[in-house]
Amino acid sequence: MSVIDVHIRIDSLRRLIDENMQMEIWPQLLRMCSDTVSDVDVDTSALMAFLVTVARKSQTAFANANAATASAFAAGGARAPAAMPAPAPPAQTVFGALVSAPSAEPALVDMRRYRAAARRLIQYYSLNTTTSSEFKVRDVVMTMIFLQRSENYHQLFKLLDTAMDDFTCRPQLTEAQVSTLLHTLRTLLEMPTTPIDMTTVDVMRSSFARCFASPVLRYAKVVLLQGETVSRDERTTLEELLVERGDNIQKLQPQQYVASGSEIPFCDDPEFINRLLKHLDPYPLSRMYYNAANSMFYTTMENYAVANCKFNIEDYNRIFKGAESIKKHANKTAEDSDELDIYLGTTAKRKKII
């Protein structure tokens, strides 16, 4: 095997396992690409960490593939394939063990609906218009799925995919790529005579970047956790979880480590204290409690989803009810505009402190 082949194999492993090359084994493997090095010493601990990482990624990919297959059959969008003789497996090498065999990708259901959603959303974010339309998170998801699965519009997907990162500028494109991108955009919008240039592309990309960075899309996410202990076939309740995990909860002990003592430093500088109070004065205490309860809501929803537990509105409302005793004893001033009487439900009302 030549040095170029070895480098290609190592680069393939890097893209599959550790794209940023943060593991310790990469400098040791790259020594094989040198013509002057006759012997290569590989650290055992680095090799074991590399193999453990490979095993975990393989287990995660296998679990995700099984979940996708089960979801497809549960939704009625897939049928059992006909039995066919399995082809002979190709010869496996050390560097080609993780290369997956090519498989036919399942066709999406009703791609015309995905195309219509993508065309409507991109047309709204690309062209100058005075009308306003309502879009949902599913419209953005359908647009990205359609662009990613369509070969003709895959270059447009790559451009919008970079908007998910913290990049302020679009990537550099050649003249051929610019011409192909503009032709692709005109074809998708079905407006061959509309003047479309790179300014239109920049407006579209910046609009999608703001859309991807919105709190609605950032909080509406699916978290995949490793292991099979986080999934349940049947939905449970909070009371059942407390009974099931009561023994483990009782065994928990508070743990705290103080590095340099627990004394609170004393400040005798009145000017600094007054300046600090001026910074804290615009932020009422009730607003701090509201932000904390809001953060607890998102964390609670994620924990409920992981445990497949039924969400009870009254359990969440106890967070605000427990803070009402503090609010009753607080001084009510005219500047206080935030309060804690916010409950979930159809009859929820918001009161203002006067």
UniProtKB/Swiss-Prot annotation:
Its main location: host cell. The keyword Mitochondrion does not apply. GO terms for cellular component: host cell nucleus. A motif (Nuclear localization signal) lies at residues 349-352. Keywords: Host nucleus, Late protein. InterPro entries: AcMNPV_C42. Belongs to the baculoviridae C42 protein family. This is Protein C42.
